[in-house]
Amino acid sequence: MAYDVIVKGAKAVRKGGTERADIAVKDGKIALIGPGIDENAEQVVQADGMYVFPGAVDCHVHFNEPGREEWEGIETGSNMLAAGGCTSYFDMPLNCIPSTVTAENLLAKAEIAERKSAVDFALWGGLMPGYTEHIRPMAEAGAIGFKAFLSKSGTDEFQSADERTLLKGMKEIAACGKVLALHAESDALTRFLEAEYALQGKIDVRAYASSRPEEAECEAVQRAIEYARATGCALHFVHISTKRAVLSIQQAKKDGLDVTVETCPHYLLFSFEDFLKKGAAAKCAPPLRSEADKEELIGVLAEGLIDMVSSDHSPCHPSLKREDNMFLSWGGISGGQFTLLGMIQLAIDHGIPFEHVARWTAEAPAKRFGLTNKGRLEEGFDADFAIVRPEPFTVTKETMFSKHKQSLYEGHTFPYRIAATYSKGRCVYQDGGRKQSGAFGTFLKPSEIKEPIL
């Protein structure tokens, strides 16, 4: 058989471990994995000494289109992800205008992404007051799941879910067999603390971080878990930043609830000290935690208590990253390009096998959200993979692919670099630049088969 692509001599990072193997691609699928594949191919990639990881599945990005393309946009955002070894992403329903809270809005965004996205994509629908009747139509239109905020979202267009909206929405989402992703921070506690600091005239990094303490995350997580018991709704907790919240979620799993949890590289690689040094570029919600909190989070990740890692790429125009008032500064990290590299660094630093990195960044999100042909280097799966070279990579403005070159990661050096990224057998990134320009992404809709709890 003649193949389209053969990657030769690499170490393939697979579910059972890392093995030296060639990978043959035909018609966008992995056709064969094994040693010494000698058949002809249109393209032969010599990858001796390199690793091949499954293409990352980033279940949490904000590309802000339509309506706020000046913040990022689907074209620049998807090419940025490709430069980081990511071959599928789930775009969140907020920061765009209009918010993705109706089937009409969801399909309009999908049409834009089909024209602009370099890699495959899925779309979250939004759970927002006044829009619960749109949940089923969005599910039928292909929403990967639904997203709600338990505290203010940061944009006027996407309101946080009050208790009635949350409970009504959870019942409907459960009836549709979908998953609700939650930004879990207590609205009451964060608003109270923010007002207290405002009265004292405290608006700096320390005040902002103190206004969103561990207790705010843990209270919201526990309340959502109890609501899940009452409604039967499957939950996915996004960007969890503390060990205590992770342990609450694990207890819910032991109790039989259908819940999963993600964290983000910035909570694993950086700490509050970096927030003090970097300022607004490092502002996010929840905020970066203490060094001790970071080490505890790494510990529960290494123990297998966190299901997956996503970027929560949430950029903005640099003018919104205000240094004079941290409460008014945009809260979001521009970091989608660095998730896979960050997790490889973490694995090297802590002696964690690379197959765990593949699970966190690819297999687990694909499985959780019903993408049955994604997330693993297996015959018959989509030929989505990243070739990674063990050579240092320093983040500079010149090596960032996001629209705006402002990031917490600037100046950071990773031990490995992305040599190339393939989406369905097509090279969409090669070290130093885009390989094939154009929009090759397709709209991913979840399988009807409901996977078991991870």
Curated annotation (Swiss-Prot):
Pathway: Nitrogen metabolism; (S)-allantoin degradation; allantoate from (S)-allantoin: step 1/1. Gene3D superfamilies: Metal-dependent hydrolases, Urease, subunit C, domain 1. It catalyses: (S)-allantoin + H2O = allantoate + H(+). It is an enzyme of class 3 (hydrolase). Its cofactor is Zn(2+). Its EC number is 3.5.2.5. Keywords: Hydrolase, Metal-binding, Purine metabolism, Zinc. It comes from the Bacteria. Carboxylation allows a single lysine to coordinate two zinc ions. GO terms for biological process: allantoin catabolic process; purine nucleobase catabolic process. One of its GO terms (molecular function) is zinc ion binding. Zn(2+) 1 binds at H60, H62, K147, D312. GO terms for cellular component: cytoplasm. The modification N6-carboxylysine is found at K147. Zn(2+) 2 binds at K147, H183, H239. Binds 2 Zn(2+) ions per subunit. Belongs to the metallo-dependent hydrolases superfamily. Allantoinase family. Homotetramer. Catalyzes the conversion of allantoin (5-ureidohydantoin) to allantoic acid by hydrolytic cleavage of the five-member hydantoin ring. PANTHER family: ALLANTOINASE (PTHR43668:SF4). This is Allantoinase. It comes from Bacillus velezensis (strain DSM 23117 / BGSC 10A6 / LMG 26770 / FZB42) (Bacillus amyloliquefaciens subsp. plantarum).
